[in-house]
């Protein structure tokens, strides 16, 4: 393909330069371009989850087949780890509960609990948890007192900068 031909031409130029000026950074640059190409070329295979068995989708929950859901992203994280990607970050938005805490917290924690639990189970069943570290964390916690109008269905909590959660598995 065109990308491969351009990369090969670039490799040839760098190799010629290295013959004249044998600097480590030139060889390093060649290796980095190759690694970037391999990573980009593997994206379609990694993101195609059509070959995942049904029991994996069942493990991760009802949103597992929905692209962009936390459950689908957890499956994608496992698939990236299988391809030896060294650092994978998942992000789950919507946790700034200054209001509607009872409804929002229940929904979001269900998504995260199911997805994270399934990811750890999946990694363990594949023997990958032995050399994979899962780190989950938030940048701040919540105060213990309510914020906003206090009703049974609509209240929130303010930020607590000295209280946060981090857990690890692996």
Sequence positions of predicted segments:
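Ligand-binding pockets and gating/stacking loops
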Residues: 1-170
């Amino acid at each position: 393909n065109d990308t491969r031909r351009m990369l090969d031409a670039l490799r040839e130029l760098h190799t010629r330069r290295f013959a004249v000026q044998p600097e480590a950074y030139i060889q390093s640059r060649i290796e980095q371009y190759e690694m970037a190409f391999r990573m980009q070329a593997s994206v379609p295979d990694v993101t195609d989850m059509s070959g995942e068995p049904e029991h994996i989708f069942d493990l991760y929950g009802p949103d597992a087949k929905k692209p962009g859901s936390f459950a689908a992203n957890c499956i994608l994280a496992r698939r990236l780890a299988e391809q030896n990607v060294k650092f994978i970050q998942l992000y789950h938005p919507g946790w700034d509960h200054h209001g509607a805490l009872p409804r929002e917290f229940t929904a979001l924690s269900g998504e995260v609990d199911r997805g994270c639990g399934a990811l750890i189970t999946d990694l363990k069943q594949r023997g990958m948890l032995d050399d994979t570290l899962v780190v989950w964390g938030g940048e701040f916690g919540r105060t213990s007192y309510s914020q906003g109008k206090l009703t049974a269905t609509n209240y929130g909590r303010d930020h607590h900068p000295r209280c946060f959660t981090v857990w690890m598995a692996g």
